[in-house]
Amino acid sequence: MTSWISALIWLATAAAGPAHVPDPPEQARPILVELFTSQGCPLCPAANLYLGELDEREDVIALGFAVDYWDIYGWRDTYAQPAFTERQRLYKTSLDVARVYTPQFVIDGAAEAEGRQTDAILSALQRRRMAMMAGVHVETLATGNGNHTIEVSGSPPSASEIWLAVFEPGWHTVAIEAGENAGLDMQLYNPVRALIPLGHWAGGQAEYGAALPEGTSGVIIVQGAQGGPVYGVGEFEQDSE
């Protein structure tokens, strides 16, 4: 565990609620867009820029996951983690993709597209919006001193996993000194620093507490097990009060 991740203070205090609770009021939630990227991938700079463009939409939460399998080609990605590569491999199976690759966009855990296929990405967003069902509600509340309470409630279509993705919001520049992008000041958008499993969930109510490191934000992801569809998301910022 790196010193950065060990600085992340989090507390999973799941409080099991009743087996069945009323569904929350129907409302549109953001769609989670994940980009699997690498600082060593020559096609990824353009995809990183497009991820930032997508995040300008009010109906999108965008995250950049750096995979580590490009690290053997001369440059070690400063954000890559094996856990992010494993997440992409789960999507490979659940979405029936022939191989892992970069840049790959995954839309709400339900569809994927290559980074240059912007029309396919936009179509997937539209399809997901049309097919989205209410049933899972994620709420976050800042409680001061950087602490947050996270509440998950409702009835997911299937047994689910709850994850906390901790990311550095906005644009970040990394000077690439080797590999296929050598000499490039590469722009990264919302790069993820940690992906933490909070637990399994089959419905009802669950509550967690989390504290984020300074300069980071968090996204709660509720999705089907083993890389299944996303059922709920909630974004929150580091609070310094």
Give the ranges of each region predicted by the language model.
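Conserved residues at the C-terminal ends of beta-strands
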Residues: 108
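Sec-dependent signal peptide recognition
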Residues: 1-10
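Active-site-proximal cofactor/substrate-binding loop regions of enzyme domains
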Residues: 10, 16-99
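Ligand-binding face of N-terminal immunoglobulin V-set domains in extracellular IgSF glycoproteins
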Residues: 105
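An N-terminal domain-start capping segment
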Residues: 13-15, 121-122
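Short, conserved sequence motifs used for protein processing/export or organelle targeting and
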Residues: 78-98, 111-241
